[in-house]
Amino acid sequence: MQKKHGITNMQKKHCITYIQSTFGNTIITLTDYNGNTKTWSSSGSVGFKGSRRSTNYAAQATAENAARVAIQLGFKFVEVRIKGLGYGKESSLRGLKLGGLIITKIRDVTPTPHNGCRPPKKRRV
């Protein structure tokens, strides 16, 4: 691996993929190592409308579409960061794998409250 301007050849083929899986949609964003967005895909942009956007099949199709574009951009290896509690978490990983990308690392970055908000006062009747 030769270094040229501080970036190795391995980093040119490596990208970071953010999967945001909500109960209504799945959004996949591909960035390079500097955090610059290269491409994105969502269930709505693939062609699913309404309640079909929140299905496992829609998440897998979205991931396959994002993987296809990533390979065209020259990326081969993927570091995945998953955020959210939606239905498309596992199926989007399967879609990235079926799309031809090699997954090197998987991290769950879902925010969890340490104590949360204060609950409302008890109701006095």
UniProtKB/Swiss-Prot annotation:
The lineage of its organism: Eukaryota, Viridiplantae, Streptophyta, Embryophyta, Marchantiophyta. GO terms for biological process: translation. Belongs to the universal ribosomal protein uS11 family. It comes from Marchantia polymorpha (Common liverwort). InterPro entries: Ribosomal_uS11, Ribosomal_uS11_CS, Ribosomal_uS11_sf. One of its GO terms (molecular function) is structural constituent of ribosome. SUPFAM superfamilies: Translational machinery components (SSF53137). This is Small ribosomal subunit protein uS11m. It is found in: Mitochondrion. The keyword Signal does not apply.
